[in-house]
Amino acid sequence: LSSHWCLSIPKSGRRIETGRLAESELIGTTQLLVDQSGQYVGSIPIDYAATGKPLFGCPGFCLASEMFEQILRDARQVTDDAGILGYHGPISVDSMVYRGPDGEPLLRSIQDVNARLTMGRIALEWCRRFGTSNRPAWLLAPIKWLDDRGWDATPDNPLRRLTSPRTVAQRDVKRVGLVLDDPADLQDLLSTYL
C-alpha cells in the first residue's frame, strides 16, 4: 500500500460509546478531511444518505453501501469485544478506503482503534449542535482563508460559526474551529485549500 493512494480517498471513523454491559451505541460516522500533506483539517458527518454519492474532496469516488455496511459491522464487533473485555467509554474505529494498484477502491475496515474522544467525535458534536443543513462540516480553518474571503465568521453566524477564539493569550491563532454550514463554502474550501 502506498500512502499516496490514500491521500485523496476518504478515511472515516465511527464514534461509539461502549457501556458497562458490553453493549455499544453508535454515535455517528464522519469523513475525515486532510490537506495535501495528510494533515487533519476537519470532519463531515456521513450516514447511509452519503452512500452512492461522491464524497467531498474525492472526485469520482462514491462510498458503496456495501462498504459502509462492512465498516459498521466490523466496528461494532471491535467495540462489542472491547466492552466484553471490560472497557467502557468513548471509542473510535477508523476505516480507510484506498486505491489499489489498478485504481479500484479497496477497503481497510479497521485502520485505527482509539479508546478516547477524537477530533471526529468533537466535530460530530459541533455539527449536531450548530449545523442546520443536511451536510455541515467542522473544520480547523486557517484564519487567512476566512479573511481572504471577507467572511463574517462569528459565534453567532449560522452559516460560518466559530467554535474557538481568534486570539489566545492576546496572540492571534493560525486556525480556528469552524462549523461551516453552506455546501458552496465547503466546496470553495476544498477546491482552493485542500
Across the structure, where does each feature detected by a protein language model lie?
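ATP-dependent carboxylate/phosphate-activation module, predominantly the ATP-grasp catalytic core
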Residues: 9-77, 86, 114-142
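Contiguous mid-protein beta-loop-alpha structural module that forms a pocket-lining wall or clamp
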Residues: 10, 80, 108
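Extended catalytic-interface subdomain
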Residues: 1-5
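Conserved metal-phosphate-binding beta-hairpin within the catalytic cores
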Residues: 83-117
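Short beta-strand micro-motifs enriched in acidic
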Residues: 6-10, 20, 96-100
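Bulky hydrophobic/aromatic packing residues
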Residues: 107, 117, 129, 153-154
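Peripheral (often C-terminal) accessory segments that flank ATP-dependent C-N-forming ligase machineries
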Residues: 132-194
